[in-house]
């Protein structure tokens, strides 16, 4: 039997598994079965806590999408990861350092229950997103058989494409998201954000996640939208991001500096399941 915890960050829901005290391995097929909301646990992503690969760090953080694919980063998951390792007694620290497949992160538990995450420095170099472009631009043209889109491209440890829209409620997120998430210029696929700017310190956002479809919230997507909006001179240093599942707060001092995300992490229930 595998012991797990169901958690969510603004409705972006996770199955979190302790791989420190349990010996666990998940095949892509098992993950897809567990992710099924009718026949399994049901989740957007599976988060696996592993012992650190580096003695200077506290844990290694792995993320699997509902389709079984392993991905580099998940911001909402990072907040739940921090809450999980404290709740389970895996650490007594309030400041937790973890590695992911794309780098290192610092997670900080606040007294009010929120979690602050140092998401690292946003990556704009196309070759490191990865995105096919000759040079860094504030906006890029993405051509599809249906229409051409104007977007920003950035990596927050995972690739993001952000499109500004006039009305977040009427945009065809599923159709456009499915069209762009596998666009040929993004060799590893891409998460697609749809951003409506309310004012320089406030945006509304919906995100079509690579391998998961539209979710109620996407932490790295919120970070990507805030960073791209600032790089395009449309947003301020501190941005409130309203997602369908709730609100995140993003702080960024600009290029070359780490970006900080603050938001909630909620425990839903503990369970066990036979693989």
UniProtKB/Swiss-Prot annotation:
One of its GO terms (cellular component) is cytosol. Transmembrane segments: none annotated. Pathway: Amino-acid biosynthesis; L-lysine biosynthesis via DAP pathway; DL-2,6-diaminopimelate from LL-2,6-diaminopimelate: step 1/1. GO terms for biological process: lysine biosynthetic process via diaminopimelate. The record marks 160, 209 as: Could be important to modulate the pK values of the two catalytic cysteine residues. Substrate binds at residues 12, 45, 65, 75-76, 158, 191, 209-210, 219-220. Homodimer. This is Diaminopimelate epimerase. It comes from Shewanella denitrificans (strain OS217 / ATCC BAA-1090 / DSM 15013). The gene is dapF.
